[in-house]
Amino acid sequence: QTTTYLHPTDGKGVTHIHSLMEYAPHQLLIGSDDGLLLFNTLTEEYKLFTENETVPNSLSNRFVYPIIKDREGGIWIGTYYGGINYISPNAEQFESFSHSRLYNSINGNVIGRFCEDAHGQIWIASDDGGLNRYSPKDRKFVYYLPADHKNSLSYHNVHALCMDGDNLWIGTYTGGVNVLNLQTGTFKVYRSYTDIPTSLDGTSSYAIFKDRSDRIWVASMNGINLYNREEDNFIRIKNLDAMTIDIDQDTKGNLWFSTQGKGLFKFHPEKQIWKNYVHNNTLPNTLANNQVNCCLIDSHGEIWAGTMNGLCKYNIEEDNFETIPLEIPSHNICSIIEDQHILWLTTTKGLVRYIPGEGCQVFTKSDGLQSDQFLPNAGINASDGK
């Protein structure tokens, strides 16, 4: 006995089937003149993939001919006029968002920071597209740009984000620091003035951090500022003579400042003690490079530093750093994100899944990533696990 599926007369069929391949148990990939179908032989449900210029990474041509699966599980799809398409076995692990003029999308293509508010909304800093807000619930983007009226973002080049209750602190390049009240939707801008010592010590900020004592630390291109809540102004703490692009706090209350060119600075606010950790070719157990992109204190209290030349781990007993040997395409570690004791490292040549003491797995564009290159600190582990 034979059964016919997907007959064109049913109104949901396909014409001119060229190839069949088992994708998974009870699932077939079907190549046709209408595109690529994923068909469930038990439920008779199917999903059609076809060419669509408005959808990133869609099929290059709807006329699908040969389909094969390689030894690694990758799917190769030949088309009539669109060349070859490839689906990585890891493709469904990553979801991409990119700017489009045709449908609701993120504004900007250069993404530098993420921040999550109490309602689960993701705030996104962009170099070229201002501030974005993404709602995972309805999958919609809203963006904020400078406007002629005063109640707007001061500049479109955004680099730092930090939540403080209902206030979102926003660091910009040359536009000062903005504070957006999420309840009222109003912006307040803090700037630098040479004749006002209680103003910020610079016009640009790449890192803003709220510590466990609810203090707000604002890093400029040169130094560190502490927000004075009572006076609504700033205390200029120290000129580091370097741009700070990340801040974190360890279990002992020390603040760690990652700088571009001057290594790591450790500061204890109560004891007012500073210490600088730098790379030294003549000494063992120093930082791998003085350009430190990021710092993470993990759930075990371990301190990790991502540098331009490798991943480093702090030895608390010896008060020094060891460089972790990793077999990865690029040792320029841009950010470190922890998820269930696994470290995710973004680099300039892909995303690395690293289990300390075990090994690495590298993901690239062929695995579904939008790009192999990441900016420093452009990553977040959101409350929904993504």
Description of each model-found segment:
Residues 1-386:
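Carboxylate-rich, polar loop motifs that coordinate divalent cations or form catalytic acidic clusters
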